């Protein structure tokens, strides 16, 4: 097991900035906006040959009701599971009542606490730290997370007290497994579904659209298979995205789609299938990611409403015939147990190796069942196929005049290969390449005999044309 370092403090003291500095990433969303981080974000910090798991938490102590109370509980959970706590305070704002309350709570936690005075850029470190001696936590480390000043000395002190990590406890890419991104509109139940799959209140859930603002990666294991769930912020229509923070959240959601191997698109059955749901599905299809459709809040619908939702699915998601549908209730757990089975199947299909002889046999069978159409009086010829990539599977077909293949025939080939190789759950991309003409770049040089013959043909053609004119 790796040691765990929790970053705690009031909102907007620089915890996410320090998290990004320690992990060498930009995983935590950072903006000059208090309360931006709401869920626990995990990363790996490496220092002088050692490593540890670092946890970014939401702000503590500002409000204990609603979302603020949920954030406080998430921070407490991080403290309870930590081997060391870095308590960040704002050197420019000075010590506050909120800092004193958090310090009192940390003293009761029975865990090593390191007080870090952040935002000391342009300030005398000794003067900035002096204001916080009254918190009763020693020693005081003055740092500037944005520039990295003092962070190395802070890590020296923290790692000196941490238990040694096992050599192979953390891979070079951090927690592994199948990366699964949860996407959808705000308040459709993504975080509730994540907590249901994990079996714990891992991310903040509240009956308010936009509770999740950052993309939170949560590694876990089920039946020997490792996964990384990525809970994302809800994406609204562009016209409704006003705040800068929300715009950054949308970007992080789109990045999560690119990072994922499988995407779960969560929709709200009570609100029906909307254009925005179809728009998000289009993003997944464009990225080429495997997809599982989750229709949440299914338990609250009567039979007529369920029939309407199924009709809307067929209408708006007609282009997602390859994706499996699951009708679930994340709140009560009905239907959730089969989701990971679909995730594994989609992931396996997206990364399947397709042997070239089998692809060519399938191509010949497809041609025998349905020949390509004529183009300008000539038959389009498809000669051979091979695999060109994974996630999504790419099948490259070589032939003549392939650039004139109709879109309908491309869909036929896509569906044929999907049925033949069981590529359900993932899009399949067909790339057509025209066979090279070995004489394409060579000048057309005639022999002497060919030139004389060409001149005779031209001469006779002119004579025939003159005779026709005289007859008129």
Curated annotation (Swiss-Prot):
It holds the Pfam family KH_dom-like. Keywords: GTP-binding, Nucleotide-binding, Repeat, Ribosome biogenesis. Residues 450-472 have a biased composition (Basic residues). GTP 2 binds at residues 184-191, 231-235, 296-299. Residues 3-166, 178-351 form the EngA-type G domain. The keyword Nucleotide-binding applies. InterPro entries: G_ENGA, GTP-bd, GTPase_Der, KH_dom-like, KH_dom-like_a/b, P-loop_NTPase, Small_GTP-bd. The keyword Nucleotide-binding applies. GTP 1 binds at residues 9-16, 56-60, 118-121. GO terms for molecular function: GTP binding; ribosome binding. Residues 352-436 form the KH-like domain. Residues 434-472 are annotated as: Disordered. One of its GO terms (biological process) is ribosome biogenesis. GTPase that plays an essential role in the late steps of ribosome biogenesis. Associates with the 50S ribosomal subunit. Belongs to the TRAFAC class TrmE-Era-EngA-EngB-Septin-like GTPase superfamily. EngA (Der) GTPase family. HAMAP family: GTPase_Der. This is GTPase Der. It comes from Halorhodospira halophila (strain DSM 244 / SL1).
